[in-house]
Swiss-Prot record:
Active site (UniProt): P2, E3, K58, R261
Sequence positions that bind DNA: H92, R111, R152
Record-stated family: Belongs to the FPG family.
Description of how the protein assembles with itself and partners: Monomer.
Organism: Xanthomonas campestris pv. campestris (strain ATCC 33913 / DSM 3586 / NCPPB 528 / LMG 568 / P 25)
UniProt lineage: Bacteria, Pseudomonadati, Pseudomonadota, Gammaproteobacteria, Lysobacterales
CC cofactor note: Binds 1 zinc ion per subunit.
Protein task: Involved in base excision repair of DNA damaged by oxidation or by mutagenic agents. Acts as a DNA glycosylase that recognizes and removes damaged bases. Has a preference for oxidized purines, such as 7,8-dihydro-8-oxoguanine (8-oxoG). Has AP (apurinic/apyrimidinic) lyase activity and introduces nicks in the DNA strand. Cleaves the DNA backbone by beta-delta elimination to generate a single-strand break at the site of the removed base with both 3'- and 5'-phosphates.
InterPro entries hit by this protein: DNA_glyclase/AP_lyase_DNA-bd (IPR015886), DNA_glyclase_Znf_dom_DNA_BS (IPR015887), Formamido-pyr_DNA_Glyclase (IPR020629), FPG_cat (IPR012319), MutM-like_N-ter (IPR035937), Ribosomal_uS13-like_H2TH (IPR010979), Znf_DNA_glyclase/AP_lyase (IPR000214), Znf_FPG/IleRS (IPR010663)
Listed name of the protein: Formamidopyrimidine-DNA glycosylase
């Protein structure tokens, strides 16, 4: 599933092609995604101008002058591309938003776990209203994590992936951040010290910022808007490397399932 760096990479690739463009039309080839695409999308978007494209957590928000925004989530396998308007649709190309410049924003989603919604006020939508702070914002600190974790018995990795705690940190970047901070993913969240949470918050910020710089992590389902690969995959320290040698100490990386998610860590480096 695309995580924050992949969604941010998508945003940065799309925004220059979308902002200021007038929407010519909308084609819904298959509206039954994770949630049905509202018919009002076809009615409200044509004729509207895109005023901004932004990100909240793993959601892309396409603001318009039609009094609302299109809310997009890539789900497990979704991708967005800006293509010449005469590009024939392929399998799983479910939505086209055609633009005045003759190009088309195309949403492809083989597994159909993504979504396209319409919302008058994005901040009040039930999917967005209860989200935690952005990890790259000043609000996300080790002191914040330590205070929120007090008394929690869940594994720290599960805690870090809770979108009400902090948004956009999924399985890949939680594993990598915990490794950099030297914290075992198995440790109870409420038993991690303030100082170690400060290291963890710094690690999350550093790894996410670097992953964005590298274009995200190209795994099975992520495609950036220009089709270029994300190069952070080449630098993963633990994720997906169970049984291999730790790149820091040389010890064998361990594997377990935590919160129904595959987890890899180094028992020597992470305590």
């Amino acid at each position: 599933m695309p995580e924050l760096p992949e969604v941010e990479t998508t945003l940065r690739g799309l925004a220059p092609h979308l902002v200021g463009q007038r929407i010519h039309g909308v084609i819904l080839r298959r509206p039954d995604l994770r949630w049905p695409i509202a018919a009002q999308i076809e009615q409200l978007l044509p004729g509207a101008t895109i005023t901004d494209v932004r990100r909240r957590a793993k959601y892309l928000l396409i603001d318009t002058d039609a009094g609302g925004s299109a809310v997009l989530h890539l789900g497990m396998s979704g991708s967005l591309r800006v293509l010449p308007g005469d590009t024939p649709p392929r399998a799983h190309d479910h939505v086209d938003i055609s633009l005045q410049n003759g190009r088309v924003l195309r949403f492809n989603d083989p597994r159909r776990f993504g979504c396209l919604l319409w919302q008058r006020d994005c901040e009040t939508h039930e999917l967005l209203a209860s989200l935690g702070p952005e990890p790259l914002s000043a609000a996300f600190t080790g002191d914040y994590l330590h205070a929120l974790a007090c008394g929690r018995r869940a594994a720290v990795k599960t805690f870090l992936m809770d979108q009400a705690v902090v948004v956009g940190v999924g399985n890949i970047y939680a594993a990598e951040s915990l490794h950099r901070a030297g914290i075992s993913p198995l440790r109870e969240a409420g038993k991690v010290s303030r100082e170690r949470y400060r290291r963890l918050a710094d690690a999350v910020k550093e790894i996410l910022a670097y992953a964005i710089q590298r274009g995200g992590t190209t795994l099975r389902d992520f495609i950036s808007p220009d089709g270029a690969p994300g190069y952070f995959e080449q630098e993963l320290m633990v994720y997906g490397r169970e049984g291999e040698a730790c790149r820091h100490c040389g010890g064998e990386l361990k594997h377990a399932t935590i919160g129904q998610r595959a987890t890899v860590w180094c028992a020597a480096c992470q305590r």
